[in-house]
Structures are given as C-alpha cells and as structure tokens.
Amino acid sequence: HQGGAGATLMPGMCEAHTHFSWNDAATLAAIQTMPLEEHVLWCAKVARRYLEAGFTSCVGAACAKARLDVVIRNAINAGQIPGPRYLAASQEITVLGALGDETLPHLPFPEFSFGVNISGADEMRKAVRLFLKYGVDSIKLNLSGDNFTPQSPADTTWMLDEEVAAAMREVKIRGKRGVAHARSSESVKQALRHGIDLIYHASFVDNEALDMLEAAKDRVFVAPGIAILYAMLNEAEEFGITKQMATDMGYQIEWDAALESLSKMHKRGIRVLPGGDYGFAFTPHCQNSRDLEFFVKYLGFTPMEAIRSTTLYGGQIMMRPDELGVIKDGYLADLLLVDGDPLANLAILRDPKRILAVMKNSRSREFCVCGVKANP
C-alpha cells in the first residue's frame, strides 16, 4: 500500500532460515565455543535487531546450544525482550563425521560438538525426545553434507532411512515439525519420503526430486540459503577464503546447480522462501532481505513475487496463514513502513534508514523500542 510522502506500508517480513545463535563468526567452532551466558545475551540482542530490520516473524533453523532457541522464544512471548514471532528449533542432529560433528579424536566429548551426534535409530529417538521435552517447535536433521565441511561435501547423503523415520515418528506424535538440511538430491527425496515439510538448501535436485517436490507443494517449503553460496564465492576473502579456494571446496558447482534447481522449483509453483544462512562472518545478521534481490536477479522472480515470498508465504510457514503475511481485516497488524517503493528498489529493505516503522500486532517496534522515525 503506497502512502503519503512516498512511503510504503507492507506486511512484516518473515525470515525462513534463522540462526539467532550464530554469532557472525567464520567457523562453526567459534560459534559453539561462545560461553552460554554470553550466548543468551547475544541471541536476545540479535532477536531485537531482526524486529528492527522489519522481520516480524522468524523460523528457527537450528541453535548452537540445546535450549537457546526455546529460551529466546519464551522470553519474546512473555514480553521480557523484544523480538519477532519465533518458532524455536533444536540443535542440528547429525551423524558421526558429518556436518555438525566438531568432536576431535582426543576430545570426543559431545559438549565440543556443534551438532548432536547420533548413530542408529535408538540414539536418534533419545536425542529427538530430549529436544521435544525442552519445548522446541521443530527438529533439525542434517541429512546431507555441506561444502563448509570438506569431509562431508554437499552432494553426499549421510543419514539412514531408519534414523530419519525414528525422528519423524517422535515429531509427529507431538504434533511438531521436522526440518532438514538437505543439499543433495537424495537427501531432498529422503526428507519428502519421511514427511519433512521444510527443506533447507535443495541445491542439487534431479527430475525425480523436482516431481516429488511439486507433488507435495501444498505442504512443503524450501528455504535455499543462496546468500551463503554467493558470499563464499565473492565476499569471504577477508576471512581467508579466496574465490579459488571456495571453487575448490565445491561452491561454484553448487551455486550453478542451485540456481538451476531453484529456478525450476519457482516455475513449478513450489514455495521458495528467503533465508540465506545469515549469522556467519561472511553473511552477517540483518542483511537478510538481500535474499529478495537475489531471487529477482538469479531465480527469475518478479519483485512482487519476491515480496510475497517473505510475506504471504511467511504467514504460511509460520503456520498462521489466516493471521499473518497479508494486510487484511481480521489479520494481526504485523506491519512495516518503508521510505520508498520496494517494488522499484528491493535494496531499500536492507537500509536501516529506510525502515520508518515496524509494528508487531500494532505495537510500534514492540515496546516502542526505537519509536517511529520520521524523515527530517
């Protein structure tokens, strides 16, 4: 809705791939080794920054310690801290040697690991039940590898069907959601077979996987995280990763494959949402709306389709399609007032000076944290 003085009123945005506890570090170990007390404060600060940046809803995609997401969600809901509506995730659950296993031969202790390491269905069941006991909204499973960890590249698939089945049985009993780190084609198919409805990455997708995604498009969401691929190839040199190193790690191949796969998904009507794995040194927090620009530039979205992916689809992925994501009578007033027209220039959404006001259920910046800024 275009308003006076060239301002635009739009629904608040939704980040579909949120890691509040990623502390803008360059390695998984540097995230994991942040002491718990400082980590809680970090998450609270980042949650507030997301709201100020126009994100009134966020979907947790994994946290670095067992209860960080749950504690932050509960504090937001109780009015103790400002922040977006939040769905809390578990830590990443992984298998020995795969993405998230940061233990060392001489330090095999689980506390040293970024993810929770399991081997077999029984260990999976125990891990999932523990996170469900803590009160998470979703269980995160690392089905595929990742080029960030060269010993388990992105096109490999690590988890056994019986391990995934054990996890999803517990998830479904509690009425919660299973989400998957799934870069490989086989891991995407595995996620779909087991009823996982939120798939992160989906970089390598063959025709069979595309057909399966399309058949399940009424229940499935894909949040690809292409910002991290772009950043690793083009913006990580100051952190010791040159373009050639990133290419040797497999990022150029994955970038090319991801753009092809995600463009095909979009054309087939599969819901692709922004969520770029922000919270690393090369993808710092609160540049998240940059994903919308990438969607237009690389995936064939129109600017309006990009906006809808973070608003209309945002309400759907938050499981509140009749309350969020649209400006309409009867919906919650999660609103964003922007200086200018995002459809003409999506980049204004990541310029703090252009965010004039954020309202979460009619409360300006929640508790009037920053008030409503007026142009001089």
Positions of the model-derived regions?
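Divalent metal-dependent hydrolysis catalytic cores, especially in the metallo-beta-lactamase
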Residues: 44-72, 82-92, 136-149, 176-177, ...
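C-terminal cap of metal-dependent C-N hydrolases
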Residues: 310-312, 329-375
